[in-house]
């Protein structure tokens, strides 16, 4: 009989077992006597797996161990792949420490502890930044201009400042001059109207016809009319003045008629029929050196009536003025006495100088027809031609030097619009320089005046 040492599979106790000669390893499993199937155990001899049909040897140690149910396999390759990745990466947060906690959680806890410890420092720094921001807002802003374009514009503006001031002064001075001239003209008209109402009876002298026109009458009469307003005279003063004016032998017959009329002391006016348009001709005063007689100019109308006007003369010493009646050749020769209420004052056009006395060359007086007062704009537009040569002016600036009033007269003489500033008037007049009337832009012409409703 042989003796072998057997280790229990469940308890792990080692005990001595006597077996019959010729017994095999399988017999040890039968001696176990458990309900577990024999297929779930195997026998090991001295640490080596023994075949179940192997004979038992005396004195050897046999262990009965249960079988472990393993997987289906294939995990080796997976482990080898993970091992390679673990060697390559530096992120160990997915690993665990010896206590079984993941390194990710451990590191997060450490970071939270440090952040909480520095919370007070962060609050203090935030408050410091807030105070600094408030101080910056309370402080006065400092402007730094480093734009080269800005500096260039400032430099150019300072250079053009003097030129702009000079142009502004020129424009303002021209406006002031025009305003003063308008005020002076209005004062003259007011003074003329006041004198006309309070003066003596006005008379219109006729009967001087056939007198020769003076060659230099236009310029002197214009200057006389511009210098002082005129009013009608009567009585002996008028008689003496007419005698002095008509003292030459050429007008002896006319002066006789005038003397008779003035000595009678009546202001005689003869009403005549005038079928043609009124045309005013200027009779200028006597020159200072020769004292020669200035004769009126004759101009025939379309129906054969002749209108003669004698210029108004304004002697400063006697303040005597004459009016401008119209005379027709075919009128009756009977003089008619006119009262002061029937005499109408005729306004003088200072710019044109065309209100004249009309005389017939006969000894007797024809009945006059009172002239209707004309506005300054109508007289200047109908009678005064353009007095400047536009071709002589090369730039608009040269035309601006003429002033607002002169430019207005030139534009009215051409029938153009006369409104606007000094620069606009000069530019408008310069645009028609050297052009015929049919070549001028129609938009530049002034619109015809509308007839006033009666």
Curated annotation (Swiss-Prot):
Coiled-coil portions: 109-143
Post-translational events: Upon binding to PCNA, the N-terminal UBL (ubiquitin-like) propeptide is cleaved at Gly-71 by an unidentified deubiquitinating enzyme; the resulting mature SDE2 is degraded by the DCX(DTL) complex in a cell cycle- and DNA damage dependent manner.
GO MF terms, alphabetically ordered: DNA binding; snoRNA binding
InterPro entries, alphabetized: RNA_Proc_DNA_Dmg_Regulator, SDE2-like_dom, SDE2/SF3A3_SAP, Sde2_Ubi
Region (Disordered): 170-193, 212-386
Record key words, sorted: Cell cycle, Cell division, Coiled coil, Cytoplasm, DNA replication, DNA-binding, Mitosis, mRNA processing, mRNA splicing, Nucleus, Ribosome biogenesis, RNA-binding
Site feature (Cleavage) residues: 71-72
GO CC terms: cytoplasm; nucleus
GO biological process, one term: cell division
Stretches assigned to the SAP domain: 399-433
Subcellular location: Nucleus; Cytoplasm
Sequence ranges of Low complexity compositional bias: 248-266
Stretches with biased composition (Polar residues): 271-303, 318-357, 376-386
Bias-annotated ranges (Basic and acidic residues): 237-247
Domain commentary: The PIP-box (PCNA interacting peptide) motif mediates both the interaction with PCNA and cleavage of the SDE2 precursor by a deubiquitinating enzyme.
Family according to the record: Belongs to the SDE2 family.
Protein name (Swiss-Prot/TrEMBL): Splicing regulator SDE2
């Amino acid at each position: 009989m042989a003796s072998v040492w057997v280790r229990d599979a469940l308890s792990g106790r080692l005990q001595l077992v006597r077996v019959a000669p010729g017994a095999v390893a399988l017999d040890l499993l039968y001696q176990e006597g458990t309900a577990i199937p024999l297929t779930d155990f195997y026998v090991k001899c001295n640490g080596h797996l023994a075949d179940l049909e192997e004979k038992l040897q005396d004195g050897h140690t046999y262990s009965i161990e249960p079988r472990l149910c393993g997987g289906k396999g294939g995990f080796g390759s997976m482990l080898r792949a993970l091992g390679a990745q673990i060697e390559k990466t530096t992120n160990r947060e997915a690993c665990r420490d010896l206590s079984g906690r993941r390194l990710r959680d451990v590191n997060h806890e450490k970071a939270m502890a440090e952040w909480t410890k520095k919370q007070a420092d962060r609050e203090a720094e935030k408050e410091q930044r807030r105070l600094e921001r408030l101080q910056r807002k309370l402080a006065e802003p400092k402007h730094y201009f480093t734009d080269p374009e800005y500096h260039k514009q400032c430099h150019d503006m300072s250079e053009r400042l003097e030129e702009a001031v000079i142009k502004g002064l020129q424009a303002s001075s021209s406006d002031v001059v025009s305003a003063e001239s308008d005020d002076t003209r209005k004062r003259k008209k007011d003074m003329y109207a006041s004198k006309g109402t309070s003066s003596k009876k006005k008379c219109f002298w006729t009967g001087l016809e056939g007198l020769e026109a003076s060659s230099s009458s236009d310029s002197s009469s214009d200057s006389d009319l511009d210098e002082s307003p005129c009013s009608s005279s009567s009585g002996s003063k008028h008689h003496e003045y007419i005698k002095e004016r008509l003292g030459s032998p050429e007008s002896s017959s006319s002066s006789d008629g005038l003397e008779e009329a003035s000595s009678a002391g009546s202001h005689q006016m003869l009403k005549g029929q005038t079928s043609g348009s009124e045309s005013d001709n200027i009779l200028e005063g006597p020159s200072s050196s020769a004292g020669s007689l200035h004769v009126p100019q004759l101009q025939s109308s379309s129906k054969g009536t002749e209108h003669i006007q004698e210029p108004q003369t304004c002697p400063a010493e006697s303040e005597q003025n004459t009016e401008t009646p119209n005379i027709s050749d075919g009128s009756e020769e009977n003089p008619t006495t006119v009262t002061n209420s029937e005499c109408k004052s005729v306004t003088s056009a200072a710019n044109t100088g065309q209100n004249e006395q009309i005389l017939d060359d006969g000894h007797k007086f024809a009945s006059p027809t009172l002239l209707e007062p004309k506005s300054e704009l109508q007289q200047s537009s109908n009678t005064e031609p353009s007095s400047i040569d536009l071709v002589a002016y090369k730039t608009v600036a040269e035309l601006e030097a003429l002033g607002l009033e002169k430019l207005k007269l030139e534009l009215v003489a051409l029938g153009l619009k006369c409104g606007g500033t000094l620069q606009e008037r000069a530019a408008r007049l310069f645009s028609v320089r050297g052009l015929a009337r049919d070549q001028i832009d129609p938009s530049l012409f002034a619109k015809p005046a509308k007839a006033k409703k009666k």
